[in-house]
C-alpha cells in the first residue's frame, strides 16, 4: 500500500515539474506585449486563465512569460508562423 502511495506521489510531482513555460502569443503569432517589466498583474492574469492553466506570469523582455502552462497552450515562437498575421 505504501508503495502505491509513493508511486502516485511521484507521478504528481513529475507532472508539476514537466509543466510547459513560455511566452503567450496573440492571434497573429506575436508575443503578448507588456511594458511593466517584472511582476505584472496583466501577465499574471492572462497566464492563469482557466483555458491556459498557467501557475504564474510576469513581464520579461516586453512579453508575457508564463510558468506551468498546459501542453495545449501555444507559446512563442510558433512553428511555420511569423509575427505578421499572414
Swiss-Prot record:
Residues bearing the modification Serine amide: 84
Domain LCN-type CS-alpha/beta as annotated: residue spans: 20-84
This protein's GO CC annotations: extracellular region
Coiled-coil segments: none
One Pfam family, short name: Toxin_3
Gene Ontology biological process: defense response
GO molecular function: sodium channel inhibitor activity; toxin activity
Tissue specificity comment: Expressed by the venom gland.
Top-level taxon in the UniProt lineage: Eukaryota
InterPro entries, alphabetized: LCN-type_CS_alpha_beta_dom, Scorpion_toxin-like, Scorpion_toxin-like_sf, Scorpion_toxinL, Scorpion_toxinL/defensin
Main location: secreted
Localisation: Secreted
Record's keyword terms, sorted: Amidation, Disulfide bond, Ion channel impairing toxin, Neurotoxin, Secreted, Signal, Toxin, Voltage-gated sodium channel impairing toxin
S-S bridge residues: 30-83, 34-59, 43-64, 47-66
Signal sequence, renumbered to the chain: 1-19
Notes on the domains: Has the structural arrangement of an alpha-helix connected to antiparallel beta-sheets by disulfide bonds (CS-alpha/beta).
Family the UniProt entry places it in: Belongs to the long (4 C-C) scorpion toxin superfamily. Sodium channel inhibitor family. Beta subfamily.
Role, per record: Beta toxins bind voltage-independently at site-4 of sodium channels (Nav) and shift the voltage of activation toward more negative potentials thereby affecting sodium channel activation and promoting spontaneous and repetitive firing.
Protein name: Toxin Cn1
Amino acid at each position: 500500500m505504501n508503495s502505491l502511495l509513493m508511486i502516485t506521489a511521484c507521478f504528481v510531482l513529475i507532472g508539476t515539474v514537466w509543466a510547459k513555460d513560455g511566452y503567450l502569443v496573440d492571434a497573429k503569432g506575436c508575443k503578448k506585449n507588456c511594458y511593466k517589466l517584472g511582476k505584472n498583474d496583466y501577465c499574471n492574469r492572462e497566464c492563469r486563465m482557466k483555458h491556459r492553466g498557467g501557475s504564474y506570469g510576469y513581464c520579461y523582455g516586453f512579453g508575457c512569460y508564463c510558468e506551468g502552462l498546459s501542453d495545449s497552450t501555444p507559446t512563442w515562437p510558433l512553428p511555420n508562423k511569423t509575427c505578421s498575421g499572414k
